[in-house]
Amino acid sequence: MIKKIYPFFLFISLISYSQNSVLFTDNFSGIESVLFNPANIIDSYYKVDVNIISSTSNLGNSYSVVKPYDILKDIEFGINDFNTLNNITNSNGNLGALKDASGLKSVDSYVLRNDYSSHSNFYGNSTVLGPSFLWSINKYNAVGFTTAIRFNGNVSNLNTDLYNQFLEKTYLDTPELLLKNDFGTLTGSGQSFSWYEVGFSYAAVPLHNSSELLKVGVSLKFLRGIKSYSFLLNNLTSNFTLNIDDLENSSLDLNGSISVASSYEGANYGQGIDIGFVYEKRNKTLPINSRDKKGNIYFNKAPYSYKVSASVTDLGFLFFNNVKQQTNNVNVNLQNSNFNISNYLGVGFQDTKKQTYLLPTTAHLNVDFNINNHWFINTNIDYYLFSDTRKYAMKTVSNFSITPRYESQHISAFLPVSINKFGILKSGVGLRTGFLFVGSSSIISNFFDESKEFDFFVGVKIPIYNSKVIKEYKRSIRKYTLDNGRGNLNKKRRH
Protein backbone atom coordinates (compact mmCIF):
# COMPACT_ATOMS: atom_id res chain seq x y z
CA MET A 1 0.00 0.00 0.00
CA ILE A 2 2.67 2.51 1.04
CA LYS A 3 4.68 1.53 -2.01
CA LYS A 4 1.90 3.09 -4.10
CA ILE A 5 1.15 6.10 -1.89
CA TYR A 6 4.76 7.14 -1.26
CA PRO A 7 5.78 7.77 -4.91
CA PHE A 8 2.83 10.10 -5.50
CA PHE A 9 3.82 12.44 -2.72
CA LEU A 10 7.51 12.16 -3.49
CA PHE A 11 6.88 13.22 -7.08
CA ILE A 12 4.61 16.02 -5.88
CA SER A 13 7.38 17.15 -3.54
CA LEU A 14 10.04 17.01 -6.24
CA ILE A 15 8.36 19.90 -7.99
CA SER A 16 6.79 21.60 -4.99
CA TYR A 17 9.28 22.62 -2.39
CA SER A 18 9.28 24.88 0.66
CA GLN A 19 10.02 28.41 1.63
CA ASN A 20 13.48 28.99 3.01
CA SER A 21 14.03 32.08 5.14
CA VAL A 22 17.85 31.89 5.20
CA LEU A 23 18.50 34.30 2.33
CA PHE A 24 15.78 36.77 3.29
CA THR A 25 17.06 37.87 6.70
CA ASP A 26 19.71 40.32 5.49
CA ASN A 27 19.16 44.06 5.12
CA PHE A 28 19.27 44.04 1.31
CA SER A 29 16.66 41.31 0.80
CA GLY A 30 14.03 43.82 -0.36
CA ILE A 31 10.58 42.68 -1.43
CA GLU A 32 11.40 38.97 -1.05
CA SER A 33 11.66 39.38 2.74
CA VAL A 34 7.96 40.31 2.95
CA LEU A 35 7.18 36.58 2.73
CA PHE A 36 8.49 36.12 6.28
CA ASN A 37 7.83 39.50 7.90
CA PRO A 38 5.90 42.38 6.28
CA ALA A 39 7.67 44.88 8.56
CA ASN A 40 10.91 44.22 6.67
CA ILE A 41 9.96 46.46 3.75
CA ILE A 42 10.18 49.72 5.74
CA ASP A 43 13.49 51.49 6.51
CA SER A 44 14.90 49.86 3.40
CA TYR A 45 17.93 50.74 1.30
CA TYR A 46 15.67 50.73 -1.75
CA LYS A 47 13.48 53.44 -3.18
CA VAL A 48 11.89 50.74 -5.34
CA ASP A 49 12.72 47.03 -5.44
CA VAL A 50 11.21 44.88 -8.21
CA ASN A 51 11.20 41.09 -8.16
CA ILE A 52 11.06 39.65 -11.69
CA ILE A 53 10.81 35.99 -10.68
CA SER A 54 12.19 33.96 -7.78
CA SER A 55 11.67 30.61 -6.10
CA THR A 56 12.48 29.18 -2.69
CA SER A 57 12.40 25.41 -2.74
CA ASN A 58 12.89 22.53 -0.31
CA LEU A 59 11.83 18.90 -0.02
CA GLY A 60 12.56 16.36 2.64
CA ASN A 61 11.50 13.22 4.47
CA SER A 62 12.37 11.12 7.49
CA TYR A 63 12.29 7.86 5.50
CA SER A 64 14.53 7.75 2.44
CA VAL A 65 18.13 8.79 1.94
CA VAL A 66 18.10 10.12 -1.60
CA LYS A 67 20.39 11.40 -4.37
CA PRO A 68 19.16 14.98 -4.91
CA TYR A 69 21.52 15.86 -7.74
CA ASP A 70 20.28 12.93 -9.81
CA ILE A 71 16.75 14.24 -9.28
CA LEU A 72 17.69 17.73 -10.47
CA LYS A 73 19.48 16.28 -13.47
CA ASP A 74 16.38 14.38 -14.59
CA ILE A 75 13.70 17.03 -13.97
CA GLU A 76 12.44 18.36 -17.29
CA PHE A 77 11.07 21.65 -16.08
CA GLY A 78 12.42 24.95 -17.37
CA ILE A 79 11.26 28.51 -17.61
CA ASN A 80 9.54 27.79 -20.94
CA ASP A 81 7.66 24.71 -19.74
CA PHE A 82 4.41 26.50 -19.00
CA ASN A 83 2.29 23.38 -19.58
CA THR A 84 4.12 21.29 -16.97
CA LEU A 85 2.32 22.79 -13.98
CA ASN A 86 -1.04 22.24 -15.65
CA ASN A 87 -0.17 18.62 -16.43
CA ILE A 88 0.87 17.97 -12.83
CA THR A 89 -2.17 19.58 -11.22
CA ASN A 90 -4.49 17.66 -13.55
CA SER A 91 -2.86 14.27 -12.98
CA ASN A 92 -5.28 13.38 -10.13
CA GLY A 93 -2.67 11.23 -8.43
CA ASN A 94 -1.86 9.17 -11.55
CA LEU A 95 1.79 8.15 -11.14
CA GLY A 96 2.35 7.73 -14.86
CA ALA A 97 1.10 11.23 -15.58
CA LEU A 98 3.25 12.68 -12.80
CA LYS A 99 6.37 10.95 -14.10
CA ASP A 100 5.69 12.07 -17.66
CA ALA A 101 5.12 15.67 -16.55
CA SER A 102 8.27 15.87 -14.43
CA GLY A 103 10.64 13.77 -16.54
CA LEU A 104 11.62 11.71 -13.49
CA LYS A 105 12.44 8.00 -13.35
CA SER A 106 11.15 5.48 -10.82
CA VAL A 107 11.52 6.37 -7.15
CA ASP A 108 13.94 3.51 -6.47
CA SER A 109 16.51 4.98 -8.86
CA TYR A 110 16.95 8.00 -6.55
CA VAL A 111 17.02 6.17 -3.20
CA LEU A 112 20.22 5.07 -1.46
CA ARG A 113 18.54 3.46 1.54
CA ASN A 114 15.37 3.58 3.63
CA ASP A 115 15.10 4.18 7.40
CA TYR A 116 11.93 2.39 8.41
CA SER A 117 9.67 3.69 11.16
CA SER A 118 6.11 3.43 12.40
CA HIS A 119 5.81 7.22 11.88
CA SER A 120 7.53 8.21 8.63
CA ASN A 121 6.99 11.69 7.21
CA PHE A 122 7.39 13.35 3.82
CA TYR A 123 7.07 17.08 3.20
CA GLY A 124 7.44 19.75 0.54
CA ASN A 125 6.31 23.35 0.08
CA SER A 126 7.11 26.14 -2.35
CA THR A 127 6.62 29.77 -3.20
CA VAL A 128 7.30 30.93 -6.74
CA LEU A 129 7.25 34.72 -6.47
CA GLY A 130 6.20 36.45 -9.68
CA PRO A 131 6.27 40.17 -10.55
CA SER A 132 6.31 42.00 -7.21
CA PHE A 133 7.62 45.28 -5.83
CA LEU A 134 8.13 47.45 -2.77
CA TRP A 135 7.97 51.24 -2.73
CA SER A 136 9.50 53.30 0.06
CA ILE A 137 7.12 56.27 0.22
CA ASN A 138 9.14 58.10 2.88
CA LYS A 139 11.01 57.47 6.13
CA TYR A 140 7.88 56.29 7.89
CA ASN A 141 5.78 54.44 5.29
CA ALA A 142 6.30 51.74 2.66
CA VAL A 143 4.01 49.55 0.59
CA GLY A 144 4.48 46.27 -1.24
CA PHE A 145 2.67 44.17 -3.84
CA THR A 146 3.30 40.47 -4.48
CA THR A 147 2.09 37.79 -6.87
CA ALA A 148 2.88 34.14 -6.26
CA ILE A 149 2.08 30.53 -7.02
CA ARG A 150 2.39 28.34 -3.95
CA PHE A 151 2.50 24.61 -3.30
CA ASN A 152 2.16 22.60 -0.10
CA GLY A 153 2.37 18.84 0.36
CA ASN A 154 2.98 16.30 3.10
CA VAL A 155 2.47 12.70 4.15
CA SER A 156 2.39 12.11 7.91
CA ASN A 157 2.82 9.13 10.23
CA LEU A 158 2.98 6.28 7.73
CA ASN A 159 4.05 2.87 9.02
CA THR A 160 6.98 2.19 6.69
CA ASP A 161 8.27 -0.45 9.10
CA LEU A 162 5.32 -2.68 8.25
CA TYR A 163 5.83 -1.87 4.59
CA ASN A 164 9.40 -3.11 4.86
CA GLN A 165 8.43 -6.28 6.69
CA PHE A 166 5.78 -7.43 4.27
CA LEU A 167 6.24 -5.95 0.80
CA GLU A 168 10.02 -6.41 0.88
CA LYS A 169 9.58 -9.79 2.65
CA THR A 170 12.18 -9.08 5.33
CA TYR A 171 10.03 -11.19 7.65
CA LEU A 172 11.76 -14.15 6.01
CA ASP A 173 14.83 -13.25 8.10
CA THR A 174 13.00 -12.42 11.34
CA PRO A 175 9.52 -14.00 11.22
CA GLU A 176 9.27 -14.02 15.02
CA LEU A 177 8.74 -10.23 14.95
CA LEU A 178 5.60 -10.59 12.89
CA LEU A 179 4.26 -13.46 14.99
CA LYS A 180 3.61 -10.94 17.76
CA ASN A 181 1.01 -9.21 15.55
CA ASP A 182 1.75 -6.03 17.47
CA PHE A 183 1.09 -3.51 14.71
CA GLY A 184 -1.85 -1.78 16.36
CA THR A 185 -3.96 0.59 14.31
CA LEU A 186 -2.32 1.76 11.09
CA THR A 187 -2.79 5.50 10.69
CA GLY A 188 -1.50 7.94 8.15
CA SER A 189 -2.58 10.85 6.02
CA GLY A 190 -1.39 12.89 3.09
CA GLN A 191 -2.38 16.06 1.31
CA SER A 192 -1.20 18.41 -1.41
CA PHE A 193 -2.39 21.88 -2.37
CA SER A 194 -1.61 24.51 -4.97
CA TRP A 195 -2.95 28.03 -5.27
CA TYR A 196 -2.44 31.52 -6.71
CA GLU A 197 -1.80 34.39 -4.32
CA VAL A 198 -1.89 38.19 -4.56
CA GLY A 199 -0.71 40.23 -1.57
CA PHE A 200 -0.79 43.88 -0.50
CA SER A 201 1.61 44.97 2.25
CA TYR A 202 2.02 48.08 4.37
CA ALA A 203 4.75 48.89 6.90
CA ALA A 204 5.38 51.89 9.14
CA VAL A 205 7.75 53.23 11.83
CA PRO A 206 5.80 54.08 15.03
CA LEU A 207 8.93 54.57 17.19
CA HIS A 208 12.30 56.07 16.32
CA ASN A 209 14.93 57.78 18.43
CA SER A 210 18.70 57.88 18.73
CA SER A 211 18.97 54.35 20.12
CA GLU A 212 15.80 52.48 19.07
CA LEU A 213 13.74 51.83 15.97
CA LEU A 214 10.45 49.91 15.84
CA LYS A 215 8.88 48.79 12.57
CA VAL A 216 5.47 47.15 12.13
CA GLY A 217 3.86 45.66 9.04
CA VAL A 218 0.88 43.74 7.72
CA SER A 219 0.11 41.85 4.51
CA LEU A 220 -3.37 41.05 3.23
CA LYS A 221 -3.46 38.13 0.79
CA PHE A 222 -6.13 36.94 -1.61
CA LEU A 223 -5.99 33.33 -2.78
CA ARG A 224 -7.41 31.31 -5.66
CA GLY A 225 -7.19 27.55 -5.29
CA ILE A 226 -5.77 25.46 -8.14
CA LYS A 227 -5.90 21.88 -6.86
CA SER A 228 -6.16 19.81 -3.69
CA TYR A 229 -5.71 16.09 -3.10
CA SER A 230 -5.72 14.13 0.15
CA PHE A 231 -6.02 10.65 1.64
CA LEU A 232 -6.61 9.31 5.15
CA LEU A 233 -6.20 5.81 6.56
CA ASN A 234 -9.12 5.26 8.95
CA ASN A 235 -8.51 2.72 11.74
CA LEU A 236 -6.73 0.33 9.41
CA THR A 237 -5.92 -2.74 11.52
CA SER A 238 -3.59 -5.54 10.48
CA ASN A 239 -3.05 -9.19 11.32
CA PHE A 240 -0.13 -11.25 10.04
CA THR A 241 -0.51 -14.99 9.39
CA LEU A 242 2.75 -16.88 9.13
CA ASN A 243 2.92 -19.91 6.83
CA ILE A 244 5.57 -22.08 8.49
CA ASP A 245 5.84 -24.49 5.56
CA ASP A 246 6.11 -21.77 2.92
CA LEU A 247 7.21 -18.42 4.36
CA GLU A 248 6.71 -16.55 1.09
CA ASN A 249 3.04 -17.47 1.13
CA SER A 250 2.48 -15.80 4.49
CA SER A 251 -0.34 -13.28 4.42
CA LEU A 252 -1.46 -10.01 5.95
CA ASP A 253 -5.11 -9.13 6.60
CA LEU A 254 -6.15 -5.47 6.50
CA ASN A 255 -9.46 -4.16 7.81
CA GLY A 256 -10.66 -0.57 7.97
CA SER A 257 -11.21 2.17 5.42
CA ILE A 258 -9.33 4.62 3.20
CA SER A 259 -10.75 8.07 2.44
CA VAL A 260 -9.66 9.99 -0.64
CA ALA A 261 -10.61 13.53 -1.68
CA SER A 262 -9.78 15.59 -4.76
CA SER A 263 -10.90 19.07 -5.81
CA TYR A 264 -12.30 20.01 -9.21
CA GLU A 265 -13.09 23.26 -10.98
CA GLY A 266 -15.12 25.69 -8.95
CA ALA A 267 -15.06 28.94 -6.98
CA ASN A 268 -11.97 28.06 -4.93
CA TYR A 269 -10.92 31.11 -2.93
CA GLY A 270 -9.24 32.12 0.30
CA GLN A 271 -7.80 34.92 2.36
CA GLY A 272 -4.74 35.28 4.53
CA ILE A 273 -2.91 37.78 6.67
CA ASP A 274 0.72 38.18 7.79
CA ILE A 275 1.66 40.45 10.69
CA GLY A 276 5.06 41.32 12.11
CA PHE A 277 7.36 43.77 13.82
CA VAL A 278 11.09 44.52 13.85
CA TYR A 279 12.95 46.14 16.76
CA GLU A 280 16.46 47.54 16.25
CA LYS A 281 18.81 48.52 19.06
CA ARG A 282 21.15 51.14 17.66
CA ASN A 283 24.32 52.76 18.94
CA LYS A 284 23.00 56.18 19.95
CA THR A 285 26.27 57.89 18.98
CA LEU A 286 25.86 56.86 15.34
CA PRO A 287 22.57 58.32 13.99
CA ILE A 288 22.84 61.89 12.74
CA ASN A 289 19.85 64.16 13.26
CA SER A 290 18.26 65.56 10.10
CA ARG A 291 15.11 67.45 9.22
CA ASP A 292 12.62 66.53 6.54
CA LYS A 293 10.89 69.02 4.24
CA LYS A 294 8.30 69.80 6.92
CA GLY A 295 10.94 70.52 9.54
CA ASN A 296 10.45 67.29 11.48
CA ILE A 297 13.56 65.76 13.05
CA TYR A 298 14.38 62.19 12.09
CA PHE A 299 17.34 59.90 12.60
CA ASN A 300 19.37 58.87 9.59
CA LYS A 301 19.92 55.28 8.54
CA ALA A 302 22.55 53.75 10.81
CA PRO A 303 23.89 50.34 11.87
CA TYR A 304 22.20 48.47 14.69
CA SER A 305 23.84 46.49 17.48
CA TYR A 306 21.17 43.82 17.22
CA LYS A 307 17.76 43.37 15.62
CA VAL A 308 14.82 41.28 16.85
CA SER A 309 12.03 40.33 14.44
CA ALA A 310 8.82 38.43 15.12
CA SER A 311 5.96 37.59 12.79
CA VAL A 312 3.05 35.25 12.15
CA THR A 313 2.47 34.31 8.52
CA ASP A 314 -0.31 32.49 6.66
CA LEU A 315 -3.05 33.13 9.17
CA GLY A 316 -6.11 32.34 7.06
CA PHE A 317 -7.95 29.75 4.97
CA LEU A 318 -8.40 28.30 1.49
CA PHE A 319 -11.90 27.21 0.48
CA PHE A 320 -12.50 24.58 -2.23
CA ASN A 321 -16.04 24.63 -3.61
CA ASN A 322 -16.10 21.29 -5.43
CA VAL A 323 -14.35 18.49 -3.53
CA LYS A 324 -15.22 14.93 -4.48
CA GLN A 325 -14.66 12.40 -1.73
CA GLN A 326 -14.79 8.63 -1.51
CA THR A 327 -14.42 6.35 1.50
CA ASN A 328 -13.58 2.74 0.64
CA ASN A 329 -13.93 -0.07 3.13
CA VAL A 330 -10.87 -2.30 3.17
CA ASN A 331 -11.23 -5.99 3.97
CA VAL A 332 -8.52 -7.76 2.02
CA ASN A 333 -5.87 -10.43 2.38
CA LEU A 334 -2.45 -9.44 1.05
CA GLN A 335 -0.79 -12.65 -0.05
CA ASN A 336 2.34 -12.74 -2.20
CA SER A 337 2.23 -8.91 -2.03
CA ASN A 338 -0.61 -8.84 -4.57
CA PHE A 339 -2.34 -5.62 -3.61
CA ASN A 340 -3.12 -2.66 -5.85
CA ILE A 341 -3.77 0.54 -3.94
CA SER A 342 -5.35 2.07 -7.08
CA ASN A 343 -8.38 -0.10 -6.32
CA TYR A 344 -8.94 2.12 -3.31
CA LEU A 345 -7.67 5.50 -4.51
CA GLY A 346 -9.32 7.64 -7.17
CA VAL A 347 -12.28 5.52 -8.31
CA GLY A 348 -16.03 6.07 -8.07
CA PHE A 349 -16.21 9.28 -6.02
CA GLN A 350 -19.42 9.10 -4.04
CA ASP A 351 -19.74 12.48 -2.34
CA THR A 352 -19.27 16.09 -3.43
CA LYS A 353 -18.89 18.78 -0.79
CA LYS A 354 -17.33 22.11 0.09
CA GLN A 355 -14.18 22.05 2.18
CA THR A 356 -12.17 24.74 3.98
CA TYR A 357 -8.50 24.22 4.84
CA LEU A 358 -6.42 26.36 7.20
CA LEU A 359 -3.23 27.82 5.74
CA PRO A 360 0.12 26.61 7.18
CA THR A 361 0.22 29.23 9.95
CA THR A 362 3.81 29.71 11.14
CA ALA A 363 5.47 31.90 13.77
CA HIS A 364 8.92 33.31 13.01
CA LEU A 365 11.44 34.64 15.53
CA ASN A 366 14.66 36.15 14.21
CA VAL A 367 17.62 37.73 16.02
CA ASP A 368 20.36 39.42 14.00
CA PHE A 369 23.66 40.44 15.63
CA ASN A 370 25.94 43.05 14.04
CA ILE A 371 29.49 41.90 14.77
CA ASN A 372 31.46 44.56 12.90
CA ASN A 373 30.03 46.71 10.09
CA HIS A 374 29.62 44.08 7.35
CA TRP A 375 29.66 40.90 9.45
CA PHE A 376 26.52 39.47 11.05
CA ILE A 377 25.28 36.33 12.80
CA ASN A 378 21.60 35.49 12.38
CA THR A 379 19.49 33.03 14.37
CA ASN A 380 16.03 32.10 13.14
CA ILE A 381 13.17 29.90 14.36
CA ASP A 382 10.20 28.91 12.16
CA TYR A 383 7.53 27.23 14.31
CA TYR A 384 4.38 25.60 12.90
CA LEU A 385 1.44 26.64 15.10
CA PHE A 386 -1.04 23.81 14.50
CA SER A 387 -0.99 20.22 15.67
CA ASP A 388 0.31 17.71 13.14
CA THR A 389 -2.88 15.71 13.70
CA ARG A 390 -5.20 18.56 12.72
CA LYS A 391 -7.18 17.16 9.81
CA TYR A 392 -8.06 20.20 7.69
CA ALA A 393 -4.89 22.25 8.05
CA MET A 394 -1.98 22.56 5.66
CA LYS A 395 1.31 21.63 7.29
CA THR A 396 4.89 22.79 7.34
CA VAL A 397 7.99 21.71 9.26
CA SER A 398 9.42 23.69 12.20
CA ASN A 399 13.06 24.68 11.72
CA PHE A 400 15.97 26.34 13.56
CA SER A 401 18.95 27.94 11.79
CA ILE A 402 22.15 29.86 12.51
CA THR A 403 23.61 31.86 9.62
CA PRO A 404 26.83 33.87 9.63
CA ARG A 405 26.97 36.30 6.71
CA TYR A 406 28.94 39.04 5.04
CA GLU A 407 26.71 41.90 3.87
CA SER A 408 27.30 44.91 1.63
CA GLN A 409 25.35 46.93 -0.92
CA HIS A 410 26.45 44.96 -3.96
CA ILE A 411 27.22 41.50 -2.60
CA SER A 412 26.23 39.34 0.37
CA ALA A 413 27.32 35.81 1.26
CA PHE A 414 25.67 33.31 3.64
CA LEU A 415 26.72 30.07 5.39
CA PRO A 416 23.52 28.65 6.95
CA VAL A 417 23.40 25.69 9.33
CA SER A 418 19.94 24.40 10.29
CA ILE A 419 18.07 21.53 11.92
CA ASN A 420 14.36 20.70 11.67
CA LYS A 421 11.86 18.97 13.97
CA PHE A 422 12.81 15.54 12.58
CA GLY A 423 16.46 16.07 13.56
CA ILE A 424 17.66 16.50 9.97
CA LEU A 425 20.81 18.65 10.03
CA LYS A 426 22.00 20.51 6.93
CA SER A 427 24.40 23.26 5.89
CA GLY A 428 24.85 25.28 2.73
CA VAL A 429 25.89 28.51 1.08
CA GLY A 430 24.10 31.46 -0.54
CA LEU A 431 25.13 34.49 -2.58
CA ARG A 432 23.32 37.74 -3.34
CA THR A 433 24.36 40.38 -5.86
CA GLY A 434 22.42 43.44 -6.94
CA PHE A 435 20.33 41.67 -9.58
CA LEU A 436 20.63 37.97 -8.72
CA PHE A 437 20.50 35.71 -5.68
CA VAL A 438 21.19 31.99 -5.66
CA GLY A 439 22.11 29.28 -3.20
CA SER A 440 21.13 26.26 -1.15
CA SER A 441 21.04 25.78 2.62
CA SER A 442 21.78 22.06 2.15
CA ILE A 443 24.35 21.92 -0.67
CA ILE A 444 27.37 21.47 1.62
CA SER A 445 25.84 18.69 3.71
CA ASN A 446 24.57 16.96 0.58
CA PHE A 447 28.07 16.89 -0.88
CA PHE A 448 29.65 15.36 2.22
CA ASP A 449 26.80 13.37 3.77
CA GLU A 450 23.74 11.34 2.89
CA SER A 451 20.68 13.47 2.22
CA LYS A 452 17.12 13.42 3.49
CA GLU A 453 16.48 17.04 2.59
CA PHE A 454 17.39 19.26 -0.34
CA ASP A 455 16.63 22.88 -1.15
CA PHE A 456 17.66 25.79 -3.32
CA PHE A 457 16.73 29.42 -3.83
CA VAL A 458 17.18 31.54 -6.93
CA GLY A 459 15.79 34.82 -8.22
CA VAL A 460 16.21 37.82 -10.50
CA LYS A 461 15.31 41.35 -9.43
CA ILE A 462 15.74 45.04 -10.31
CA PRO A 463 16.90 47.11 -7.31
CA ILE A 464 16.59 50.90 -7.37
CA TYR A 465 18.57 52.16 -4.40
CA ASN A 466 17.70 55.20 -2.32
CA SER A 467 20.95 57.12 -2.76
CA LYS A 468 20.20 59.42 0.17
CA VAL A 469 19.74 56.49 2.56
CA ILE A 470 22.89 54.80 1.28
CA LYS A 471 24.88 57.99 1.92
CA GLU A 472 23.42 58.28 5.42
CA TYR A 473 24.41 54.72 6.23
CA LYS A 474 27.94 55.07 4.88
CA ARG A 475 28.36 58.32 6.82
CA SER A 476 27.30 56.53 10.01
CA ILE A 477 29.77 53.73 9.28
CA ARG A 478 32.58 56.26 8.83
CA LYS A 479 31.61 57.96 12.09
CA TYR A 480 31.60 54.58 13.84
CA THR A 481 35.06 53.79 12.47
CA LEU A 482 36.45 57.19 13.50
CA ASP A 483 34.94 56.94 16.98
CA ASN A 484 36.43 53.48 17.43
CA GLY A 485 39.79 54.74 16.21
CA ARG A 486 39.80 57.63 18.68
CA GLY A 487 38.71 55.30 21.47
CA ASN A 488 41.54 52.87 20.75
CA LEU A 489 44.05 55.73 20.53
CA ASN A 490 42.94 57.14 23.90
CA LYS A 491 43.32 53.71 25.47
CA LYS A 492 46.90 53.48 24.20
CA ARG A 493 47.72 56.95 25.55
CA ARG A 494 46.37 56.06 28.98
CA HIS A 495 48.61 53.03 29.06
What is the role of each PLM region?
Residues 4-14:
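Sec-dependent N-terminal signal peptides
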Residues 19-495:
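Subset of outer-membrane beta-barrel
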